[in-house]
Amino acid sequence: MSFLVSKPERIRRWVSEKFIVEGLRDLELFGEQPPGDTRRKTNDASSESIASFSKQEVMSSFLPEGGCYELLTVIGKGFEDLMTVNLARYKPTGEYVTVRRINLEACSNEMVTFLQGELHVSKLFNHPNIVPYRATFIADNELWVVTSFMAYGSAKDLICTHFMDGMNELAIAYILQGVLKALDYIHHMGYVHRSVKASHILISVDGKVYLSGLRSNLSMISHGQRQRVVHDFPKYSVKVLPWLSPEVLQQNLQGYDAKSDIYSVGITACELANGHVPFKDMPATQMLLEKLNGTVPCLLDTSTIPAEELTMSPSRSVANSGLSDSLTTSTPRPSNGDSPSHPYHRTFSPHFHHFVEQCLQRNPDARPSASTLLNHSFFKQIKRRASEALPELLRPVTPITNFEGSQSQDHSGIFGLVTNLEELEVDDWEF
């Protein structure tokens, strides 16, 4: 009799046994504050949101059976080409979803363990601004993860295809508010996200903001006690290096904590406002030195770019640097409007500049917490819910598909979406 268990069977047992038996218990365990924990509690608004948002309100779960899903077209690859992302239709309701299929036979044991951690976190977390997994199951030798299709794609998709010089400030405020609410919850649960960036911010057809990238989350709780710092370097993190804080990149004995995510929020704010991530295309060693030496990215506008540079063509400006003290040569980039003026001839509010400066403090202790940032003056301009305001602010962008929740069995036009879907960097979504 063989005691060897295949990787698909091992993860199948883990999914069925651990999630069913320990799911609710884990929600209670990690939701409690560890003894002696003196960290700041979440603000009242966030706490109310967490308390009132029941598991049933996240989204109805789908049946964990491959036959319930009609795979329509491949819209992306990822996880070192072991993952295929499909647009699919959930047959019982006709709703269009995203199905992420991972070939477990080709995964190393380390990858399987990595995936187990992601699935555990997906069951543990329950928040309106965190992407919910509608179903997770094994089909043949593949792990299937089902999520709702995000019709606006990611924030990175938006800046790559429509807002090449950056988004408007109010839209960014709505997006970052959703991200900070998710981070406030994640930190309250004792985790560090470690992968906040525009491609991990998804926007649904109705303008709701979701934070994804759960695969990189790390628990700061060990043996029931919250650790002051952690030292683990994120696996498979090559694509996220520009967003990582100096203390994470430094990998020394001082370690890092949840404040490292706040630095990533600051970098993401610059990414959304400038149309590209700071430290873009910079070698990893140089990037580390820049961050350790205190080089701080900024919002590119009339207050940070010298007036003489604003009269130059974009090809001779700081357009692609994201750093206020460097002059780079780059190819011209299209602007949002028809005006021939410099794309960064604009002015962001002092509140937005201060918000970014606070997030990018070199000393982690000087950075505000997520709950504190939610009360920052930058967000005072928000007057409506994101679901009401964001679709208007994203115009002329329209959702890629309006099939979400449809009961129709008619697929006419669905394959006409393929061209648009291929423009999305779905392999970066990481749900």
UniProtKB/Swiss-Prot annotation:
Changing residue 185 to F: Suppresses STK11/LKB1 activation without affecting complex assembly. The modification Phosphoserine is found at residues 2, 46. CDD domains: PK_STRAD_alpha. The modification Phosphothreonine is found at residues 329, 419. Residues 312-339 have a biased composition (Polar residues). GO terms for biological process: activation of protein kinase activity; G1 to G0 transition; protein export from nucleus. It is found in: Nucleus; Cytoplasm. GO terms for cellular component: cytoplasm; cytosol; intracellular protein-containing complex; nucleoplasm; nucleus; serine/threonine protein kinase complex. Its main location: nucleus. PROSITE patterns: PROTEIN_KINASE_DOM. Keywords: ATP-binding, Cell cycle, Chromosomal rearrangement, Cytoplasm, Nucleotide-binding, Nucleus, Phosphoprotein. The keyword Nucleotide-binding applies. It is linked to A homozygous 7-kb deletion involving STRADA is a cause of a syndrome characterized by polyhydramnios, megalencephaly and symptomatic epilepsy. Belongs to the protein kinase superfamily. STE Ser/Thr protein kinase family. STE20 subfamily. The protein kinase domain is predicted to be catalytically inactive. Component of a trimeric complex composed of STK11/LKB1, STRAD (STRADA or STRADB) and CAB39/MO25 (CAB39/MO25alpha or CAB39L/MO25beta): the complex tethers STK11/LKB1 in the cytoplasm and stimulates its catalytic activity. This is STE20-related kinase adapter protein alpha. It comes from Homo sapiens (Human). The gene is STRADA.
